[in-house]
Swiss-Prot record:
The family this protein is said to belong to: Belongs to the Mediator complex subunit 10 family.
Location relative to the cell: Nucleus
Protein name: Mediator of RNA polymerase II transcription subunit 10
GO cellular component, one term: mediator complex
Gene Ontology terms describing biological process: regulation of transcription by RNA polymerase II
Gene: MED10
Function: Component of the Mediator complex, a coactivator involved in the regulated transcription of nearly all RNA polymerase II-dependent genes. Mediator functions as a bridge to convey information from gene-specific regulatory proteins to the basal RNA polymerase II transcription machinery. Mediator is recruited to promoters by direct interactions with regulatory proteins and serves as a scaffold for the assembly of a functional preinitiation complex with RNA polymerase II and the general transcription factors.
Any Pfam family the entry gives: Med10
Main location: nucleus
Transmembrane region(s): none
Molecular function per GO: transcription coregulator activity
The organism of origin for this protein: Aedes aegypti
Domain of life: Eukaryota
Subunit-structure text: Component of the Mediator complex.
PANTHER family xrefs: MEDIATOR OF RNA POLYMERASE II TRANSCRIPTION SUBUNIT 10
Length: 130
């Protein structure tokens, strides 16, 4: 038996196919095709009702930005790529800050060791840095 997500995906694919077929019928509409169009529209409504029933079985959170990408005609998969790129950039910034703090600590300890050797020796002994 298909998982709820797979079931929803199948219904969405059928819905999209149904919309595509309706578009074809409407783009070259002939009066004798009215019954077929009515059937397709009814099947579209039924498909939406089925999708509505399935929505409670699937818990998927889609960031609103993904819909912005779609509205702009961009590939929604680019959202993931952009998020990864932003995370890498932020990671590099944080790594730079960490490295700066380590250098600062090292220089501070060196200066303090020269200025207050006894106190720094006690500090290092307490911390176990010897």
């Amino acid at each position: 038996m298909a998982s709820p997500l797979e079931n929803l995906e199948n219904h969405l694919e059928m819905f999209i196919e149904n919309v595509r077929q309706i578009r074809i019928i409407v783009s070259d509409f002939q009066p004798q095709g009215q019954n077929v169009l009515n059937q397709k529209i009814q099947s579209l409504v039924t498909g939406l009702q089925e999708i509505d029933k399935l929505k409670n079985q699937v818990d998927v959170n889609v960031p609103l930005e993904v819909f912005d990408y779609i509205d702009q005609g961009r590939n929604p998969q680019l959202y993931t790529k952009d998020c990864i790129d932003k995370a890498l950039t932020k990671n590099e910034e944080v790594k730079g800050k960490i490295d700066s703090y380590r250098k600062f600590k090292s220089n501070l300890m060196k200066e303090l060791d020269e200025t207050f050797p006894t106190e720094i020796a006690k500090y290092k002994a307490i911390r176990g840095d010897e």
